[in-house]
Amino acid sequence: SLVGSEMCIRDRRRDHTSAYIDLLRSYLMEVLGGSASLPPRRGRPAKPFYNFPVLSSAAAKAAPAHPVPGTQLDFAGGTNFRELGGYEADEGKHIKWGQIWRGIPTCKLTGEADRAKLDALGLRLILDLRSSGEVQKEPDYVPDGARLVQICGLCAEDGHEISFAPDDIAALMKGYEESADGSTFVQAMYERMLFGNKAFKELFRALEAGETPILFHCSAGKDRTGVAAMLILLALGASDETICADYERTNLCRKAEIDAVLAEHAEEITANPACRMRYYRKAGVDPAAAPFVLRTIRAKYGSAENYLEAEYGLTPARLMRLRRMYLE
């Protein structure tokens, strides 16, 4: 019938229009380099246009194979320099590669090959989480095109920078009972970092502003850097298991340093096994510290989302935007 013919024509036009929209979207995705900012198209799925599949991003097809997430870069000058790219996060998406780096002071990377490798990262911002005293002893190397910001990632309640001098440690431990294995010191240090941290506020400001690739680091890339990385992963929707695994990966990256410290204090450890973890933490991290951080956040704020909004201004809308920026 005439009505049936008109409906059939409208269906074909709708199918072709739908296919054209998908072609346009895939073109935009290709031009934007696989940007996650394009929302899913509403409506029913499009049929292939002229029996050809909808185009996918050529950039994604041409992308080189990536290593296992958390694999450190091979620098002669130091260990534990790695990125957050590749980790699974919100809605099963993954963190974009080459954007968020966690590492060590760039002054340690003095060799020609190390400098070339560092320069090739195309860093726009280096956030140094060390104290001013640490920075004066070993100032960072800043590649062309990058800018350096130094904000201590561990400060006392009065704003005084903690430099791990005896007086600073005593002030940090005020109100805590010292334990044989040193676990209370780690808890005091990590809990202090979680609240009112100006360095971490700058870190999230830079991420929201798209000031990437970014490198954040402390002296060994394990404690101040480790907590900062945990918070980024938390904000991007990674699971607790992923967050803890990245934190603990420091022990794999710094195995040689850990073994050396334990060997140096072998006699003392044999006489008093309880002190083993104290020495272990000098070069590595305590696996129990990451779950402690997550528990502390949720105990005070009820949820990670409440914490991120209260401490860093990441409202639900801003958090969603951050995830669109760094997940794919």
Tell where the protein language model's regions lie, with residue ranges.
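N-terminal, intrinsically disordered charge-dense segments
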Residues: 13-14
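Short, small-residue-biased leader/transition segments that mark boundaries at the very start
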Residues: 2-9
